[in-house]
Amino acid sequence: MIVIDSSAFSKFLVREEGWEKVVPCLDPSVEPRAVDILIVEVSNVIWKYMEKYKLIKEEQALKLYEQMMRLIKEEIMVIEPSVKYLRDALKIAMGYSITVYDSLFLAQAKALNAKLVTSDRRQKEIAEDIGIPVEYIP
């Protein structure tokens, strides 16, 4: 079982450099999971690519959103409610001075005894410090 955070999933979805390394993490046999905040965070990345960076058009943005939702609806990646991990996430956030958004993925990985897949260096460092196996995809 693995937990994919928003940074790694966004890399895959918008095809940032190194996105291919995320593909094996979406194989149903490794039981990929994430917390529901991933949907909001990745939707925001899509918006930024369109609105702020002007790298995609509205039609492309909506297609990326639909691709993400298809992966979730087809249960390629299991999405769990954030509230399930919120207390532990808050503890991690306070202990490491990071956002609760980021710490939710750490709390989920820890609770599930799962490997965390991330493209966030700070997330990687905290995971290692907490004892969570981590795959860093820069």
Please provide the spans of the model-predicted regions.
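Phosphate- and divalent-cation-binding pockets in alpha/beta enzyme and binding domains
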Residues: 21, 41, 88, 125-126
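Acidic, PIN/NYN-like endoribonuclease modules and their adjacent C-terminal/linker elements
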Residues: 1, 35, 79, 106-138
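Residues that scaffold the ATP/ADP-binding catalytic core of kinase and kinase-like folds
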Residues: 11-13, 45, 126
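Short, well-structured N-terminal submotif of metal-dependent ribonuclease cores
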Residues: 1-37, 52-62
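Alpha-helix capping/helix-boundary segments
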Residues: 8-9, 38-39, 85, 105, ...
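Active-site neighborhoods of divalent-metal-dependent phosphate/nucleic-acid chemistry enzymes
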Residues: 74-115, 119
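Active-site-proximal, substrate-binding regions of enzyme catalytic domains
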Residues: 43-82, 86-88
